[in-house]
């Protein structure tokens, strides 16, 4: 069906993105990138914030390459998160003004003050300590990013935008299948807000569907969409884009062989 085709394209572009990132270290085939991407997805399902994806992809490479592979994976995931955050903030802002949310602005102001204070101390702390992300210092991470060719960054962000457009449209297409009366613009505003809210909540990837569903049910309730409909759509999205690919990924995990060392 068309929904499955959209899921295939979603992962096709993710695999292309990974293949391109890895090419800065060594050339790999599309099939190798597919094996690593789906194998990483399978490993990530039972780990917090999909951290298993980093280790799973790294062990496909020789020991001397593994640290850089982790960094490349971090850059690939970060680009997707940046797109989700930017479009999500825009969507959530429009959502707020469209539906006139009943917010306690005094509490919001206090939270913003706390966030600013914490951010200020964090920036100061980063300058005074050896803070690390995924085991790497900020200085090394920045240097690694700077040393990557500009075309790699452009390619990376370009494919991240394409993937975002695909799975967002897939959600909208499911709304149409379930005969939900909602225009494309309104749906995209709510969908982008949903992905933002879901992405900032740490969880096991296997429970990702619960977080997305909760956010979707809450946001779509303002548009008068039935809870059961949103629950069904969110579950289908999860099955198509995570469970189905992870089933194929489990084959690669079960048949995995450590690479020959070059030591």
Residue ranges and their predicted role:
Residues 1-37, 94-201, 240-263:
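Predominantly cytoplasmic-facing regulatory/coupling regions of multi-pass membrane proteins
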Residues 40:
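Functional transmembrane helices that embed catalytic/metal-coordinating motifs
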Residues 43-138, 209-263:
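Transmembrane helix-loop-helix hairpins in multi-pass inner-membrane proteins
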Residues 43-45, 193-211:
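Transmembrane alpha-helix interface/packing and boundary motifs in multi-pass membrane proteins
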Residues 29, 50-51, 182, 204-205, ...:
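Secondary-structure boundary/capping signal
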């Amino acid at each position: 069906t068309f929904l499955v085709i959209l899921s295939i394209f979603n992962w096709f572009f993710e695999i292309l993105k990974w293949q391109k990132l890895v090419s800065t270290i060594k050339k790999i085939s599309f099939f190798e990138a597919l094996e690593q991407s789906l194998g990483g997805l399978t490993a990530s399902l039972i780990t917090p914030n999909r951290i298993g994806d980093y280790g799973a992809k790294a062990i496909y490479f020789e020991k001397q390459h593994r640290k850089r592979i982790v960094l490349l994976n971090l850059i690939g995931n970060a680009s997707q998160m940046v797109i989700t955050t930017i479009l999500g903030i825009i969507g959530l802002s429009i959502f707020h003004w469209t539906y006139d949310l009943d917010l306690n602005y005094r509490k919001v102001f206090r939270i913003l003050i706390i966030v600013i204070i914490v951010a200020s101390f964090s920036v100061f702390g980063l300058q005074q300590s050896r803070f690390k992300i995924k085991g790497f210092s900020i200085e090394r991470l920045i240097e690694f990013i700077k040393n990557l060719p500009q075309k790699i960054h452009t390619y990376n962000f370009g494919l991240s935008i394409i993937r975002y457009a695909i799975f967002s449209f897939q959600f909208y297409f499911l709304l149409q299948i379930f005969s939900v009366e909602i225009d494309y613009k309104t749906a995209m505003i709510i969908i982008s807000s949903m992905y933002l809210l879901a992405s900032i909540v740490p969880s096991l990837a296997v429970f990702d569907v619960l977080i997305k569903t909760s956010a979707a049910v809450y946001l779509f309730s303002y548009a008068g969409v039935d809870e059961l409909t949103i629950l069904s759509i969110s579950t289908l999205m999860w099955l198509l884009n995570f469970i189905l690919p992870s089933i194929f990924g489990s084959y690669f995990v079960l048949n995995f062989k450590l690479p020959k060392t070059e030591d």
